[in-house]
């Protein structure tokens, strides 16, 4: 559902914050 999409986007943002050295695909 929409909530799943929102949580997915938030998860990606958190990963980007925790792993800033990871190159964006």
Swiss-Prot record:
Protein keywords: Amphibian defense peptide, Secreted
Tissue: Expressed by the skin dorsal glands.
Subcellular localization, as worded in the UniProt entry: Secreted
Pfam family, one: Antimicrobial24
GO cellular component: extracellular region
Swiss-Prot/TrEMBL GO biological process terms: defense response
Primary location: secreted
Family statement: Belongs to the frog skin active peptide (FSAP) family. Aurein subfamily.
UniProt function note: Has no antimicrobial or anticancer activity.
Protein name in the entry: Aurein-5.1
Taxonomic path: Eukaryota, Metazoa, Chordata, Craniata, Vertebrata
């Amino acid at each position: 559902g929409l909530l799943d999409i929102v949580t997915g986007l938030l998860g990606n943002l958190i990963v980007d914050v925790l792993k800033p050295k990871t190159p964006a695909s």
